[in-house]
Amino acid sequence: QEASDRKYYRIKADNVSYVLADNFDKTDQSANFLYASKILKNSSVNVPEVLAFSEDLRFLLLQDLGDKSLDTDKEFKAEKILEMALEQLSKIYFSDQDVLRSATKESLLIQTNSFIDFCKENKLSNDELKALENLRNNLVQNLLNQQFIPTHNDFERRNLMMFEENLFVIDFQDLNMGPIGIDLASIMYEHSYEYPKVLIDDLLEKHLKNNGLKASSEELKNMIMHALAHRSMRIVGAFNKYFKEGKLLNRKSDLDKFLKRIHLALSTLKKDEAKIVKKLLCCLLYTSDAA
């Protein structure tokens, strides 16, 4: 089950297994999924087959890709997973751009509104809140200056599955034109995995050459760090909102991991606001210990 209230069921007919997605009244998500699926398949991205859907788009019948979600499966080495993931990401880049909506300054700023709410709830001073407000505006400005390409927006291991020795991409309904750093930050600096710097550097160098991207290695790393800070702020804010609604409580332990990702990004970029995030981390850990 997803935070969006979407539910998945595995069903069998004639000894063949399928996945039934129930989107309840969120039929706009179903429409986006179907649209993105067609775009990605046309670009040879491995995505599950859509076999049928109800007239009102509440239900989607999908190909069953099994249970090897790459955020839990330990069979595959990190280097192999990242290489295969970047191969699929390269194919996403070559999706039809003309039919995709584009991220805007407004949409990117909205994504981190809830992070400021989280900071207010954790008793930061007015000066600290003002500094973070300026920071999120600066992050968005950097993102807007990046090369815009087709973007999954949540390109991490839990949205990648291994099926018949091929890596498949799922949950791609938010596909749009976005900053190049977003998907690379998602997969290379995922909250639960610490990859060796030499591996990240090597893979990013190859990724640059293979895709003819308009950046040097250092410029790309800078873009990724700005995207990592923004993405992690978005997720911290979203988690905090879900927790207050009684949703995703099993992921409370991930909150500090995303704060650490914000701190990593800001420290790498030599941003003074890293100290404020460090304070948030200390407050969160103290609260957890007290509980």
Q: How should these model regions be labeled?
A:
Residues 1:
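Protein kinase glycine-rich loop
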Residues 6-11, 92, 137-182, 194:
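Active-site acidic catalytic loop and adjacent metal/ATP-binding pocket
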Residues 9-105:
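ATP-binding pocket architecture of kinase catalytic cores
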Residues 48, 73-126, 146-148, 176-177, ...:
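A cross-family kinase active-site recognition segment
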Residues 102-106, 216-228, 253:
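All-alpha amphipathic helical-bundle segments outside canonical DNA-binding/catalytic cores
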Residues 113-122, 180-214, 226-247, 258-266:
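Active-site activation/catalytic loop segments of kinase-like enzymes and analogous catalytic loops
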Residues 281-284:
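Eukaryote-biased recognition of C-terminal alpha-helical segments
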Residues 286-291:
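Conserved small/polar residues in nucleotide/adenosyl-binding loops
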